[in-house]
């Protein structure tokens, strides 16, 4: 039996990933992965699109089978430390996810407040950063620190996103 690989921690454009959920499924299948979990940050938004892509492509090919796992990466705090917890095999039915969706909405509201604070801090340091510009740069993705870094790079404030 050939050795097969799985990826249980991936992100799509529903949070801070580079590929749409459907493209991520296609890439995973083309790499021959046995299973893929979509675990976007604090959202379930990409799961249905990814599942549709799996259904369209099928779960079997002549060479291998493929399993899609519904997941989410949950942001949490433990004192001053931030923790990321993977939730896997998340249900499809509203009754299965209503409490989780409520909690995720709270987390997204906290993230929005953090983004407002980051934009204000950068303006206080003399950089003309508006949250609207960061959101436009994110192109519908969940706005996060990398988008602020990309805007600062575009403005010529830094030489790299890492900086």
Regions inferred by a protein language model and the residue ranges of each:
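An N-terminally biased module of ancient metal coordination in phosphate/nucleic-acid-related enzymes
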Residues: 1-81
């Amino acid at each position: 039996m050939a050795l097969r690989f799985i990826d249980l921690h991936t992100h799509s454009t529903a949070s801070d990933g580079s590929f749409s959920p459907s493209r991520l499924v296609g890439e995973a299948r083309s790499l021959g992965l046995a299973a893929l979990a979509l675990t976007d940050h604090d959202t379930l938004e990409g799961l249905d699109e990814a599942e549709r892509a799996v259904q369209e492509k099928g779960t079997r090919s002549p060479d291998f089978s493929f399993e899609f796992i519904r997941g989410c990466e949950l942001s949490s705090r433990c004192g001053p430390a931030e923790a990321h917890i993977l939730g896997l095999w998340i249900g499809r039915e509203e009754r299965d996810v209503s409490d989780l969706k409520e909690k995720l909405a709270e987390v997204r509201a906290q993230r929005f407040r953090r983004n407002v604070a980051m934009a204000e801090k950068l303006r206080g340091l003399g950089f003309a950063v508006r949250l609207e510009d960061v959101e436009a740069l994110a192109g519908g993705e969940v706005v996060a620190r990398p988008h602020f870094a990309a805007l600062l790079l575009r403005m010529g404030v830094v030489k790299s996103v890492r900086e």
